[in-house]
From Swiss-Prot:
Protein family (similarity comment): Belongs to the RNA polymerase alpha chain family.
Subcellular location: Plastid, Chloroplast
Biological role stated in the UniProt entry: DNA-dependent RNA polymerase catalyzes the transcription of DNA into RNA using the four ribonucleoside triphosphates as substrates.
The EC number(s) this enzyme carries: 2.7.7.6
GO biological process: DNA-templated transcription
Protein name: DNA-directed RNA polymerase subunit alpha
Gene3D superfamilies named in the record: 5' to 3' exonuclease, C-terminal subdomain, DNA-directed RNA polymerase, insert domain, RNA polymerase, RBP11-like subunit
Keywords tagged on the record: Chloroplast, DNA-directed RNA polymerase, Nucleotidyltransferase, Plastid, Transcription, Transferase
The organism of origin for this protein: Agrostis stolonifera (Creeping bentgrass)
Alpha N-terminal domain (alpha-NTD): annotated segments: 1-233
Domain notes: The N-terminal domain is essential for RNAP assembly and basal transcription, whereas the C-terminal domain is involved in interaction with transcriptional regulators and with upstream promoter elements.
GO MF, one example: DNA binding
Amino acid sequence: MVREEVAGSTQTLQWKCVESRVDSKRLYYGRFILSPLRKGQADTVGIALRRALLGEIEGTCITRAKFGSVPHEYSTIAGIEESVQEILLNLKEIVLRSNLYGVRDASICVKGPRYITAQDIILPPSVEIVDTAQPIANLTEPIDFCIELQIKRDRGYQTELRKNYQDGSYPIDAVSMPVRNVNYSIFSCGNGNEKHEILFLEIWTNGSLTPKEALYEASRNLIDLFLPFLHAEEEGTSFEENKNRFTPPLFTFQKRLTNLKKNKKGIPLNCIFIDQLELPSRTYNCLKRANIHTLLDLLSKTEEDLMRIESFRMEDRKQIWDTLEKYLPMDLLKNKLSF
């Protein structure tokens, strides 16, 4: 993420594609802008869209292959140059395009000698191959080669446990991530009170959908996440109707920190260094990068300040409070700690 100062004028909020190109069958690029945004809004939108694009977009891939009586994935098959493991890795790289849901069957059945590519996969009508030239295997002898495949539409990266199946069926780690990379940059425009921000968003996809299609799907997914809040009042949801549902504790992390700050007597917080708290190295490094060195520094930050720290996660927030409770008993927290 990059910030720069540029000259600009205030306009109605709008977005447009400023660059679009196809670098190869499996690499599409798009660059978009959204403006004008108030200070801080570009970061909010950029972070949300980046996460939604990388983790919420659905993709179709091969998830299982059945070779017949093959003892294990490191086996070699007579007349085939590649091992079973190499063939599985090649199948994992095949990029598919579809709108199917659930599991579908596909297959490969050819006779050597010849090269096998993605074009040789027999697919259901609803599935297309993005790059038919992707290699799968090389048959060096006149043998019959048949594989049964399973295809699934999903999202994210799904790792399968490696097992030796007696029927020769092997799982393939599913990479259902059509968006290969996302980058955003923020440019500040105007002067004084007229200052606003422009968000530039760059998207690279694997060719199964265009960057514009990916942006639309990510935006739709984000909207769907917030819809329950918009309809909650209309549905007349009450505590009585939802008494069996989980309710987050009212005593939040931020309230706990606020209570600590209210204490005026006791151990000086600027004499307690975060090194003494025995925090996990990941949490400790996040705090150090944000120039938080003492307990006073930590308690001077709001919950929002902490969540804005690079690489800081919800788990880090919980770890900080759990550590404070462990090393500083609640009666001490309530009565003795001070600034």
